[in-house]
């Protein structure tokens, strides 16, 4: 393999609030600007720009080091990107005005920064102050709330190609002063940039948060915004043992349901190909997708096997949303929908594969045992049940994603939770399944697979 002509490492490490750092100085924005300029000049096969941790020159950042020659740069800005790419990366001439030439001075500055950092750590420990990482975890909700509020206001779409705070406030029907404060907070998170009083979306925000972008994640993230309200009841839920706002999916508003299904569709679309590869679609003629939501998994299985027919069972509020995705995928002749309640309605029979994805965490133990038993009855001999969910390890303390998601079910459902591998195994064994196994997958969810005896 041929290495890149230049490997450019740019620090974007964020230090505790108030401490000088490359992250606070705009390191991420510099990285994005360099990557854009490298692409614009057609040098992507010759230059690799990589984010890295501290280079030890925190008070002079953003800092970068360019290999193979080991050229150091400090105090970089967005405006420096075109010159760096043109002069250094294209023409091989380091930019003298930005270059750190005195090796002894650089080493002394690194040592001074290290000593200052260690002294600050010792002082904090002696004072009994919270460790920085713990303090940041406790306060992390502030960043989430800023982003979620911006998404609820569709602020990034309104910013578009750029706008002043007063104009943006008028378009979102909000207070000008408060809107400007929100924009400044977003700028501190490097999701927008402010230049000459005009706010612009960062490349990340433009890609994932704006209407018209093919990667727009806002519709699904509005479901995350709605979770803010339920998670705010966690203390009450822990005291009472159940959610404070009990509502089933069919009882929610249409806006909530659309946001929820949009979020589930985005997640499923990302996970569908790995799931199909892990389970296998060949030899499957009839598939049941229990609570299939948007239909993303059925669509993926149908695409992988032209002889497969899938049947999605879901609520009346969800089925029209699934039909829209099915029609867009061009598989309406082989992916069918049926309105029904997975808790009570007949599942059918003779299926080669039954998929239960993101369902078991909404149910209690008895409901899961009952559903898994009914899935066994719906399968043809030799057919397989695949459960995809947040699966806890036996001690229920890990993985972290499943442990936290269990609380999401506490605050959002009457009796849902994340369940452990031994619990799934026991339910499947009691139903009659054999060859039961857990399959670890990329991302937070895993699989439990069992076979009905031939």
Roles of regions detected by a PLM:
Residues 66-68, 194-195:
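Structural motif
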Residues 26, 30, 77-80, 84, ...:
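General structural feature for long, well-ordered alpha-helical segments within catalytic domains
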Residues 5-25, 48-67:
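Local cysteine-cluster metal-coordination motifs and their immediate loop/turn environment
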Residues 71, 75-124:
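Fe-S ferredoxin-like electron-transfer domains
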Residues 124-184, 188, 194, 281, ...:
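Alpha-helical subdomain
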Residues 124-164, 170-173, 177-285:
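Conserved Class I S-adenosyl-L-methionine-dependent methyltransferase catalytic core
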Residues 16, 73, 314:
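Small/polar loops that bind or transfer phosphate-bearing groups
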Residues 27-49, 71, 75-90:
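Ferredoxin-type iron-sulfur electron-transfer modules in oxidoreductases and energy-metabolism complexes
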